[in-house]
UniProtKB/Swiss-Prot annotation:
This is Molybdenum cofactor sulfurase 1. The modification N6-(pyridoxal phosphate)lysine is found at residue 228. Residues 607-762 form the MOSC domain. Its EC number is 2.8.1.9. One of its GO terms (biological process) is molybdopterin cofactor metabolic process. It comes from Aedes aegypti. The keyword Transferase applies. Gene3D superfamilies: Aspartate Aminotransferase, domain 1, Type I PLP-dependent aspartate aminotransferase-like (Major domain). The active site is at residue 394.
C-alpha cells in the first residue's frame, strides 16, 4: 500500500523539464480539468502561427495544394490510430457531438432495427434518441453490457441495429473492454434475438490519453474531438467510418462540395461517390485541420516513443500513475474522528491501466459524514488557484448511478429548482453532482499535492472544537434594541471600492443614485471584476452630489476628478457596448484621461471606464425593477450582527497576520445597506423590509463567491469566510439578502435614505 501512495514519473528528468517549460503561462495555477480540455503547448501554438504567417492556405475547393495537405492530415490521424484509409474513412466534423448527430441522422435501420445505448453515456449520445430512424430505443446497464463478453448467442442476420457506448466514461475514467466491439458485431446482444448490431464507439474521453488500436479493434463508427488530445484547435472532431459500414449511412442534406450536380430550378441532385466527399458539407475548417500536424509533432517531441511504447501509450502510463496517486491519497484522508474525508465514485481501484483512465471523481464529506456541496468545493478550489470540474459532467446516467439516485430522486431535484450546470449542489442534504479532477501529459505530482493541501486545509478538522463562542458570552445586544440602518455604501464603479455614507443618500429608479453606474472594461470590452483583478478594490471613488463630481483615489497616485455632468453633453458622448452578467449594456466612454489613470492604477494597459447610459433599461430575469450594473438586484442588505456571528464561527484566520476587524469583514460582503439587528441571521426570514418611511421587497438571498475572501482594504485573498459559510450552511453559499424598492417615484422627485433609520423586517 505504501508504494501505491507514492508517485514515480514515467518521464525522464529532461522530458519533465521540457514539458514544464511549455506551460509557464499557468504560473501559480493548478489545472485539473483535462477531461474537459487538455492544454496546448507554447511551442505548438508558435508553430501553428508561423505556419499561417509563412504559407498561403487557400480554400481547398480552390487550391489542390490545400486539398493535398488535408489528405496528409487524414493519413496522419489514421496512422495515430494504427489504421489506414483502405479500412476507415475519416469525416471531419465540429466535434464528437456533431459526429454523433451526423450518425444518428444518417444510420439506416432495418424495419425492426433497434437503437441501444449505454446508460452511462454522454448527453450527446442521449440526444441521438430524438432523431434516430427507429422507435425501438433501449438503454443498457453497465453490468448487462459487460456480460456480453460471456454471452454465447450468435446472430446471422444482416446488420439492422446500432449500439453506442464509450471506450472510457468521462465521469470517472473507467474503460470498457474493447473486446466488446468484436463480440457484439459477431454475436449481437443478449435479449435482442438474432439482430445484428453495428457498433459506434464514443472515443472522445479515451483517445485523449490512451491508444486506440483500430487494427486490433474495429468499431463500425468512431467519434472523437481533437482538442481533447492536443488542446488546440477547438471546434474540430471526426467521425471514422469502417468501409464495411459505409453503405448503412444515408445522408439527406447536401451542402457545397458534396454533389456531382445540383439544379436550382428542379429538385434534382447527385451526390459524390466517395463517402468523405458526400458527408463533408461546405468548406472545411482547413486551417484548424492543418494545425493538427503541429499537435502530433508537439506530442511526439515532448513525449518521444521508446522501445515498445508509442507516445500516446507513454502518456497513458503517466496519467494512470498520477491518477492512482491522487485516488489513493484522497482515499486515505481522515477526519480527527477517523471518518473518511472523501467519498469516491469509481468502478475500479486503479489497479489496471487497461481498465482505468486518468480521472478521479469524488465528493467531500464533513466530519459528521454529511456532504460538502460541490459548488463550495469549486469556490474553495478557485481561491487556491485550482481549476477543476463539478456537476454531472454531461453524463446523467453515470452521475445517477454513482450518487445512487432513483429516477424519482432526479425529478424531485429538478422540481426543487436544480438544473444542469447550476450551483444547486445539495438538496435535502443529498448531492446533485460531484467533483472531478482529470489529468493530461503535463500534469505534475505537485498539482495533486496542491489539491490535497486545499482539502486538508479547508475541510479536515484536526481537533474537535470545545467551549463557548464569543457570541454566547457577549451580551451587549439586547432583545429590545431596535434594528437600525448603520451605514449606506455605494459602489460607483462596479467591483471597485465603496463610498461610505453615514448621513443620507438619494435614490434613483435603479437603486442608490450613482451605485454601480460605471464599469471598467479591458481592451476587448469585457467587464472587469475583482475575481480577475483583486486590486480593483484599491480604487476608491467618492461622489460629491453638490458639485456633481466623482473623485478617484488610489494609493500612491494623485486623485483624479471626473465631471459627471460633462458626460451627458451630446458632443462628448461615445456610445459603447459591453456585457455585464450576461446582459449587453449600452454605455458611454468616459474619455482617454480617466482611462489612462485607471490603466496605470491597475497596471493593465488598454482599460476604459464606461458609464451606463441614462436611457438604458436593465432588469434581472422577470423583475420589473430597473437595476444599474449590479449583478441582480437594486440593493444588498448586510446585517452586522450576522457578520459578527459568522466571525465567531471561523476557527482561525491562519492565512492572515491578525484577526480582521468587524468593519473589514462587513466590507468584504460589499453590501449597500448595513444594518444592525438584535439577533443574527434574522434577516433570512424577512419577506418585506421598511427603512424609515421607504418600503422594500426581499428578492431572495445573495449567493456568495470568492470575492468575499478578498480584503477590501488590501486586495489580499484568503479562504475565509467563504469556507465557514459553506460549512455552517451545508454547502449553501448564501449571505445577505437582495432588496428592491417597492414604490420608487417616477416623476423625477428625489427620495432619500437616512442612516440611523429604524429597520423593520416582516416575515409575512
Amino acid at each position: 500500500m505504501e508504494a501505491m501512495m507514492n508517485f514515480t514519473s514515467q518521464y525522464t528528468v529532461e522530458e519533465a523539464l521540457a514539458i514544464e517549460n511549455e506551460f509557464s503561462r499557468l504560473k501559480e495555477k493548478c489545472y485539473l480539468d483535462h477531461a474537459g480540455t487538455t492544454l496546448y503547448a507554447d511551442s505548438q501554438i508558435r508553430s501553428v502561427c508561423e505556419g499561417l504567417a509563412q504559407n498561403l492556405y487557400c480554400n481547398p475547393h480552390t487550391s489542390r495544394t490545400t486539398e493535398d495537405l488535408l489528405d496528409q492530415v487524414r493519413y496522419r490521424v489514421l496512422r495515430h490510430f494504427n489504421t489506414r484509409s483502405s479500412e476507415y474513412s475519416l469525416i471531419f466534423t465540429s466535434g464528437t457531438t456533431a459526429s454523433l448527430k451526423l450518425l444518428a441522422e444518417s444510420f439506416e435501420f432495418a424495419p425492426e432495427g433497434a437503437f441501444v445505448y449505454l446508460k452511462d453515456s454522454h448527453t450527446s449520445v442521449l440526444g441521438m434518441r430524438e432523431i434516430v430512424g427507429t422507435e425501438r430505443i433501449y438503454p443498457v446497464e453497465r453490468e448487462q453490457l459487460l456480460k456480453e463478453l460471456d454471452s454465447s448467442e450468435r446472430s446471422d442476420n444482416e446488420h439492422s441495429s446500432l449500439i453506442v457506448f464509450p471506450a472510457q466514461c468521462n465521469f470517472n475514467g473507467v474503460k470498457y473492454p474493447l473486446e466488446l466491439v468484436r463480440k457484439i458485431q459477431r454475436d449481437g446482444i443478449s435479449g435482442y434475438g438474432k439482430e445484428r448490431f453495428r457498433v459506434c464507439l464514443d472515443a472522445a474521453s479515451f483517445v485523449s490519453t490512451s491508444f486506440l488500436d483500430l487494427s486490433k479493434y474495429q468499431p463500425d463508427f468512431v467519434c472523437l474531438s481533437f482538442y481533447k488530445i492536443f488542446g488546440y484547435p477547438t471546434g474540430l472532431g471526426a467521425l471514422l467510418v469502417h468501409h464495411t459500414a459505409a453503405d448503412q449511412l444515408r445522408k439527406k442534406y447536401y451542402g457545397g462540395g458534396t454533389v456531382k450536380i445540383a439544379m436550382a430550378g428542379r429538385i434534382f441532385h447527385v451526390k459524390r461517390d466517395p463517402l468523405v466527399e458526400r458527408f463533408e458539407d461546405g468548406t472545411l475548417a482547413f486551417t484548424s485541420i492543418i494545425a493538427l500536424l503541429q499537435g502530433f509533432e508537439t506530442l511526439e517531441r515532448l513525449v518521444p516513443s521508446t522501445a515498445g511504447l508509442r507516445t500516446i501509450e507513454r502518456i497513458s502510463q503517466q496519467t494512470f500513475h498520477i491518477g492512482r496517486y491522487c485516488y489513493n491519497r484522497l482515499k486515505a484522508l481522515r477526519h480527527s474522528n477517523e471518518n473518511a474525508v472523501v467519498k469516491l465514485y469509481h468502478d475500479t481501484g486503479f489497479e489496471d491501466r487497461g481498465l482505468q483512465g486518468g480521472i478521479v471523481n469524488f465528493n467531500i464529506l464533513h466530519e459528521d459524514g454529511t456532504y460538502v456541496g460541490f459548488a463550495e468545493v469549486s469556490y474553495m478550489a478557485s481561491l487556491h488557484n485550482i481549476l477543476l470540474r463539478t456537476g454531472c459532467f454531461c453524463n446523467p446516467g453515470a452521475c445517477q448511478r454513482h450518487l445512487q439516485l432513483s429516477d424519482e430522486d432526479v425529478l424531485k431535484q429538478f422540481d426543487a429548482g436544480h438544473v444542469c450546470g447550476d450551483a444547486n449542489d445539495l438538496i435535502d442534504g443529498q448531492p446533485t453532482g460531484s467533483v472531478r479532477v482529470s489529468f493530461g501529459y503535463m500534469t505534475r505530482k505537485e498539482d495533486i499535492d496542491c489539491l490535497l493541501e486545499m482539502i486538508e486545509k479547508c475541510y479536515i478538522r484536526k481537533t474537535i472544537a470545545n467551549g463557548f463562542t464569543r457570541t454566547q458570552i457577549v451580551s451587549k445586544y439586547k432583545s429590545h434594541d431596535q434594528p437600525r440602518l448603520k451605514m449606506i455604501c455605494l459602489f460607483p464603479i462596479k467591483s471597485c471600492g465603496a463610498f461610505k455614507v453615514t448621513t443620507r443618500w438619494p435614490l434613483s429608479r435603479r437603486g442608490l443614485k450613482h451605485d454601480r453606474e460605471f464599469v471598467i472594461v479591458d481592451e476587448n470590452g469585457v467587464a472587469l471584476t475583482q475575481k480577475k483583478l483583486a486590486e480593483m478594490c484599491l480604487i476608491r471613488p467618492q461622489i460629491n452630489v453638490k458639485t456633481n463630481e466623482m473623485t478617484l483615489s488610489h494609493p500612491g497616485m494623485a486623485d483624479f476628478v471626473l465631471q459627471l455632468d460633462l458626460l451627458g453633453e451630446s458632443q462628448r458622448i461615445k456610445l459603447c457596448q459591453t456585457k455585464v452578467c450576461q446582459d449587453n449594456v449600452q454605455a458611454i466612454d468616459c474619455g482617454d484621461q480617466v482611462a489612462e489613470w485607471i490603466s496605470v492604477a491597475l497596471q493593465t494597459s488598454g482599460l476604459r471606464l464606461l458609464k451606463q447610459s441614462d436611457e438604458e433599461v436593465r432588469t434581472f430575469q422577470q423583475s420589473k425593477q430597473e437595476i444599474a450594473l449590479a449583478n441582480q438586484a437594486q440593493f444588498l442588505l448586510i446585517n452586522q450582527a450576522s457578520v459578527r456571528w459568522l466571525a465567531d464561527k471561523v476557527p482561525d484566520w491562519d492565512e492572515l497576520h491578525e484577526e480582521p476587524t468587524l468593519e473589514s469583514l462587513v466590507d468584504r460582503f460589499r453590501g449597500n445597506l448595513i444594518v444592525e439587528t438584535p439577533k443574527s441571521m434574522e434577516e433570512c426570514d424577512w419577506k418585506r423590509v421598511t427603512i424609515g418611511y421607504l418600503e422594500f421587497a426581499v428578492d431572495g438571498p445573495c449567493s456568495r463567491c470568492q470575492m468575499i475572501c478578498i480584503d477590501q482594504g488590501t486586495g489580499v485573498k484568503a479562504t475565509e469566510p467563504l469556507r465557514t459559510i459553506g460549512r455552517e450552511f451545508k454547502g449553501k453559499m448564501r449571505f445577505g439578502i437582495y432588496l428592491s424598492h417597492v414604490n420608487p417615484l417616477r416623476d423625477g422627485s428625489e427620495q432619500w435614505l437616512y442612516c440611523n433609520s429604524v429597520v423593520e423586517g416582516l416575515s409575512e
